[in-house]
Structures are given as C-alpha cells and as structure tokens.
Amino acid sequence: MIKYKIGDLLTAPQKCIAHQVNCQGVMGSGVAKAIRDEYPKVYKEYKEFSNYWIRTNKAMLPGYSQIVYTENKCIFNLFGQINYGYDGQRYTSYAHLAIALDRCFSEMCEIGETEIAIPYKMGCDRGGGDWEVVESILKDLSEKYNIDVYVYSLEGYVCR
C-alpha cells in the first residue's frame, strides 16, 4: 500500500528511509544531499562502498540496495542510476531501481520492518524518470512484500 504524506522525509516517523543514489559515489543534490548532510555516516559508508566497487567491478553496483544503520534510522541507498547530470536526460534505470527496491523490501522483511518512507518522485526530479513508472514499481513490490510505503513531499509540492 502507498500512502502520500506532506512533510520532511528526514523527520518521518518510519524507521526505514529509502532513496535513489547514483553509482559514482556522489551525493551532491536533492534528497541524497539532504541525507548526506543529516546523516554523515550514511554518506561515508556509501562513498566507501561505491569507491570499492568502482575500483573492482563497477557492474556490481546498479540494482544494489545498501542498508546503513544510524542511531534511529535504517537508510537504504538504492543504486538506481549509473550516472547523473542536469541536462534533462533520464538517468534513472527503471530495471535497476526495481531490482534495488526488491532487495530493499526483502531485507526489510528479514529485519522485521513493514513501513518505509521514500521521497515523492524518487528517481524522477534529479534522475529524470517518470513518476508513474516508479509509482507502479512501488505498488507492485509493496503488495509482493506487504510493505507500507509512505511517500513524502515537502509542503507546496503536488502530492496525491
């Protein structure tokens, strides 16, 4: 089930948060930058993990779901785009995002979590994806794993 909420993703009551990241080791804008600033440990582990795979076998990163535990949250870095840019191209790979989300939801079941918060238009604003496609992936996987997905939008943004 998907529920839409207006509010700050980083202060959401859900223990788990997921967001899309690129495979370049950069959290330079959007929600990724906000998470980097709020949770330095998440960025440190993402950077180390990305750099390791960039050096050894970069093909392993797309579709990966990295979980980082902080003091009060578990953050899932979803490797759904290989590159990034600001030129209007689509950098989000729906296939890689779906694989990462599938792994994320599977890991949630293993640790006993049933709710997750994600940003509205994940993979769409910065990644250039189509929200209807991403939303469809979320709906299918939330039903498959019986996970409640809370989609957060800051006040002033359109949210269903």
Task: Give residue spans per PLM region.
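Macrodomain-like recognition of ADP-ribose-binding/processing modules
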Residues: 1-160
